[in-house]
C-alpha cells in the first residue's frame, strides 16, 4: 500500500488547493463547534451554503436536533458522534469549497449501505460541478463511476 505519491491533473504538477479536496479514512474533527468544523475558518461562506451542505450530506435534521444547532461544541454535545456523522461533517466541509476534484481514500466504507448509496449517487451526479476520484478496493463503486482503473 503506497504511503505517498503525486497528484497530476491535466499534466499540471501542482494543483491549487482550492480546486481539489481529499478525505481519507482518518475520520477526525477538531475541538470546537460543528459550524467551525464545517466552515474551517472560511468566514466568507454564507449561511445558506452551510445549510445546503447539511442537506446534501443528510445532516440537517441531526444537527438541528442539537440544543445549540451549529453552535454545539463537538466535545460538549454530551454524546460521541458516530463515524457516519463525522464522515458527513467532513464531506460537508469539503463540498463547501465547490472544488473541481474530490478525492476519497477508503472513507465510504464507514457509511450505512442506504446512506452510502444515496451519498454516492449525489456525489457522482452529472449535475454536480466536480469530478470524483475514489481510492478503494470496493467493487460496489463500479456502477457509480464512469471509469475504473485497477492497479496491478
Model-assigned labels for residue ranges:
Residues 96-100, 129:
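A short, proline-enriched helix->beta-strand linker immediately N-terminal to the Walker B motif
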Residues 1-55, 117-118, 124-128:
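Conserved post-Walker A segment of ABC ATPase nucleotide-binding domains
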Residues 30, 60-89, 93:
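ABC-fold ATPase nucleotide-binding domain signature/coupling loops
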Residues 109-111:
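ABC ATPase nucleotide-binding domain "signature" loop
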Residues 22-23, 73, 135:
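Hydrophobic beta-strand positions within the nucleotide-binding domains of ABC ATPases
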Residues 114-116, 121-138, 142-143:
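Conserved catalytic loops of ABC-family nucleotide-binding domains
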Residues 143-150:
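Conserved catalytic segment of ABC-fold P-loop ATPases
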Residues 102-106:
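Catalytic Walker B motif of ABC-type/P-loop ATPase nucleotide-binding domains
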Amino acid at each position: 500500500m503506497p504511503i505517498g505519491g503525486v497528484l497530476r491533473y491535466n499534466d499540471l504538477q501542482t494543483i491549487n488547493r482550492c480546486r481539489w479536496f481529499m478525505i481519507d479514512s482518518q475520520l477526525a474533527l477538531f475541538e470546537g463547534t460543528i459550524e467551525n468544523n464545517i466552515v474551517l475558518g472560511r468566514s466568507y461562506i454564507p449561511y445558506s451554503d452551510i445549510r445546503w451542505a447539511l442537506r446534501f450530506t443528510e445532516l440537517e435534521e441531526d444537527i438541528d436536533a442539537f440544543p445549540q444547532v451549529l453552535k454545539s461544541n463537538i466535545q460538549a454535545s454530551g454524546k460521541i458522534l458516530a463515524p457516519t456523522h463525522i464522515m458527513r461533517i467532513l464531506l460537508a466541509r469539503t463540498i463547501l469549497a465547490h472544488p473541481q476534484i474530490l478525492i476519497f481514500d477508503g472513507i465510504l466504507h464507514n457509511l450505512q449501505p442506504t446512506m452510502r448509496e444515496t451519498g454516492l449517487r449525489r456525489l457522482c451526479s452529472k449535475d454536480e460541478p466536480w469530478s470524483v476520484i475514489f481510492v478503494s478496493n470496493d467493487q460496489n463503486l463500479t456502477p457509480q463511476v464512469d471509469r475504473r482503473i485497477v492497479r496491478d
